[in-house]
Amino acid sequence: MATDTSQGELVHPKALPLIVGAQLIHADKLGEKVEDNTMPIRRAVNSTRETPPKSKLAEGVEEKPEPDVSSEESISTVEEQENETPPATSSETEQPKGQPENEEKEENKPSEETKKDEKDQSKEKEKKVKKTIPSWATLSASQLARAQKQTPMASSPRPKMDAILTEAIKACFQKSGASVVAIRKYIIHKYPSLELERRGYLLKQALKRELNRGVIKQVKGKGASGSFVVVQKSRKPPQKSRNRKNRSSAVDPEPQVKLEDILPLAFTRLCEPKEASYSLIRKYVSQYYPKLRVDIRPQLLKNALQRAVERGQLEQITGKGASGTFQLKKSGEKPLLGGSLMEYAILSAIAAMNEPKTCSTTALKKYVLENHPGTNSNYQMHLLKKTLQRCEKNGWMEQISGKGFSGTFQLCFPYYPSPGVLFPKKEPDDSKDEDEDEDEDDSSEEDSEDEEPPPKRRLQKKTPVKSPGKAAAMKQRGSKLAPKVPAAQRGKTRPLPKKAPPKAKSPAKKARPSPSVIKKPSGSSSKKPAASVRKEVKLPGKGKSTMKKSFKAKK
């Protein structure tokens, strides 16, 4: 049969479907017999079933057979067989497909596990870095306890190697200095955690470092052998040289300042926008401005805040009235708020208590170059980059955006500087101005007290009638001034009673001034006694003229 089917040219096209159909029927009969016995033969039958349609398709691509009754029957039988066989083939095909899927899953699992292990290792490395609490952080006792639990302080059970070396040299000092052998024994005995027996290079490095600094001096030997002495006078000459340098050119106090200490203040000044709640403002003002007595009189602070909002110096973001959050407004770089002591206190409180404190690296670079330029600007930028990285590792700062030396950083601990630290130039000027104002007020009051009486005296001549309050005040001053004038004029008034007895013609004239002298001190004005004195001064002249007339009459 195979030879007949293979020679397609000899077979008539109409006879081809009949031959194929006969083959299929014969195969079906064989399959029915074998189905009851074993399954493996069925697989072979399936393979034979599948081959004829392939050959049929290969041979009959060009020639399309005409449909006959026999062909229709054969097609129907093929369809029935195909409908019966799929469950077995589907299960068979699923088995080999399922195996590679399982293999792929098994391969993916180890890759995922390796990724997880890498992540865990990176997290462990991050956890291993001990986060410390910075010296500039302003924390209460409860906040400090919480922070210590969350970020345990890096305990330092022993000092640094340089300090240990100087301590050992002083302890082992003799006439010829301290030998390296004695120094080593001392350190091994007192600081066993260093393991100096195994790590002898630590001692050599420390000796070399301290020799270069000039802290110690080598008396005997060379290198890491011999005897050493601590130089005590090395600290005084540099101070003198510094003083001389400062006298000649006072420029180099900056190297002593660390960028780690500068950054928190830079963050507080550069952070924008600055805003704080009423409770924080009140807390800060009551702490640093006790003269305002905000705890006793909170209404003063509330009124000042409301007044600043009405003027446009502050913006109330949340809340109503004096409660809520207030934000500073600026014209350029200068804040609009300022002037009185209360306004200055509110300004410093909002600037200091603003949280969270964030700042961009560009603003930090500009601030450092303007305020702490150093000798080399490029080196200063390098130091700034290193300090930011170190602060981030210690957990003092956090990079919110960007990577490396770009983006924005944020302080992880609260920092509330005092007004003197926040505005060092403004506060002393304000205090001086306040003192000057007080002095001016006192001096003006004293001058007014001294200058007030003369115009009153002039008015007294013009207007004898005065209020009872002024009269009482003038009585006291009149009592002080009255005894002084007669004391100076007593020498001139005394000769009057001596020359009075020979006078006979002028009793009426002399009787007139006596009541005026008695009445004038009892009067309300202080000028009247002075006027009476003037009249008394003129009286001797009149007395002399009368005396001359009396002498002439006697002659």
Curated annotation (Swiss-Prot):
Which of UniProt's keywords are assigned here?
Answer: Acetylation, Chromosome, DNA-binding, Isopeptide bond, Nucleus, Phosphoprotein, Repeat, Ubl conjugation
Q: Which SMART domains match?
A: H15
Cross-link entry Glycyl lysine isopeptide (Lys-Gly) (interchain with G-Cter in SUMO2), positions: 64, 97, 258
Write down any Gene Ontology CC term: nucleus
* Annotated spans, Disordered: 29-134, 227-254, 422-555
Sites of Phosphoserine modification: 6, 142, 155-156, 248-249, 443-444, 448
Bias regions of kind Low complexity — which residues?
Answer: 513-532
Ranges of Basic residues composition bias in the record: 233-247, 491-512, 545-555
InterPro entries named in the record: Histone_H1/H5_H15, WH-like_DNA-bd_sf, WH_DNA-bd_sf
Alphabetized GO MF terms:
DNA binding; nucleosome binding
Q: What is known of its domains?
A: A central region that included the first H15 (linker histone H1/H5 globular) domain binds at the entry/exit site of the nucleosomal DNA.
Q: How does it assemble?
A: Interacts (via PxVxL motif) with CBX5.
- Write down what this protein is called: Heterochromatin protein 1-binding protein 3
